[in-house]
């Protein structure tokens, strides 16, 4: 039997259930509650209250998301785009990426080492490695520096 989200208490409970599993951004949480049948008139006050209580925190969500994606080997460009697609303000994304303590160049080298382990021998290999690293979200400048054998340390 589906849970009906037609009261403030039901909406709050559903939101807290989602937040208990992992951090969510306000836009993402609102979207999930709407998908479950809650109205905007019930969602907005519930999310406002959760934010006041510190249970819904965009900065904590950003920090958690960035750390998770960085551990998975994703670069700042891909992380930035994923967060923007989730409805977060660009200024908040930039602030969070600037505050994170990830050494992106070291991470780029580690991702490259795990996948390829040797510098490209020809233009085809170089293009292949470059495409892979660009897809993972690293800048072309950093990729070029790495694939040309120059260190940016």
UniProtKB/Swiss-Prot annotation:
Signal peptide positions (record): none
Gene Ontology BP terms: regulation of DNA repair
Subcellular locations according to the entry: Cytoplasm
Disulfide bridge positions per record: none
Predominant subcellular localization, coarse grouping: cytoplasm
One Gene Ontology cellular component: cytoplasm
The keyword Ubl conjugation is annotated on this UniProt entry: no
HAMAP family reported in the protein's UniProt record: RecX
Family annotation (NCBIfam families): PRK00117.2-1
Function statement: Modulates RecA activity.
Family of the protein in this entry: Belongs to the RecX family.
Protein name: Regulatory protein RecX
